[in-house]
Amino acid sequence: MANSSPVYDWFQERLEIQDIADDIGSKYVPPHVNIFYCLGGITLVCFLIQFATGFAMTFYYKPTVAEAYKSVEYLMTDVSFGWLIRSVHRWSASMMVLMLILHVFRVYLTGGFKRPRELTWVTGVTMAVITVSFGVTGYSLPWDQVGYWAVKIVSGVPAAIPVVGDFMVELLRGGESVGQATLTRFYSLHTFVMPWLLAVFMLMHFLMIRKQGISGPL
């Protein structure tokens, strides 16, 4: 590379970063690809916004039944731009779900789930389930009337499953009733377990797309 900087030369000598850049930049893009093939990328951008704004809110949120609502209220009224951070988090959550739905429809209608891309489809559907679960767990965190009763209803749904239903309800709630243990579990799922799960499946999803390329036209 002509007129390269010493910093570039240092990294190039050790990591051969130019080869990596050439490989990324030279990936073939089929001529049939249009704006609707960007829906998956937009979903990723929404997730990154969710991660950044969610991380910012953890500095102020208190996951206890006594202080959760007050901490959210404090974030919205007293923290500089706290209202904006939480609002962006909510808006990007809605946008992420919408883009995900449109992305799934695009892939299905263009046959992107067919052989040899079955595993790519499976990882995508798994991410869709995790994304919906994000919404369910996040909805409860303010611990207001809406959040409380939403958790009570959602966590009671598995009771209809034969044999293991009652066990699953107690596992979700952390006991026989909805309370502090429930909020702690939902907070842990929303801020730690699900982000890591989604990140792992995203990596698998992108690596398979990178390996197999974009599916052809119908």
From Swiss-Prot:
Cofactor(s) needed: heme b; heme c
Membrane topology: Multi-pass membrane protein
Signal peptide per UniProt: none
Residue positions binding heme b 2: 89, 190
Location relative to the cell: Cellular thylakoid membrane
BP-aspect Gene Ontology terms: photosynthesis; respiratory electron transport chain
Transmembrane segments: 35-55, 93-113, 119-139, 189-209
Binding site for heme b 1: 103, 205
Sequence positions that bind heme c: 38
Chief subcellular location: membrane
UniProt xrefs under SUPFAM superfamilies: Transmembrane di-heme cytochromes
Keywords (A to Z) from UniProt: Electron transport, Heme, Iron, Membrane, Metal-binding, Photosynthesis, Thylakoid, Transmembrane, Transmembrane helix, Transport
Keyword Thylakoid annotated: yes
UniProt cross-references to HAMAP family, sorted A to Z: Cytb6_f_cytb6 (MF_00633)
Subunit structure: The 4 large subunits of the cytochrome b6-f complex are cytochrome b6, subunit IV (17 kDa polypeptide, PetD), cytochrome f and the Rieske protein, while the 4 small subunits are PetG, PetL, PetM and PetN. The complex functions as a dimer.
Functional summary from the UniProt entry: Component of the cytochrome b6-f complex, which mediates electron transfer between photosystem II (PSII) and photosystem I (PSI), cyclic electron flow around PSI, and state transitions.
Family of the protein in this entry: Belongs to the cytochrome b family. PetB subfamily.
Protein name (record): Cytochrome b6
Organism: Synechococcus sp. (strain CC9605)
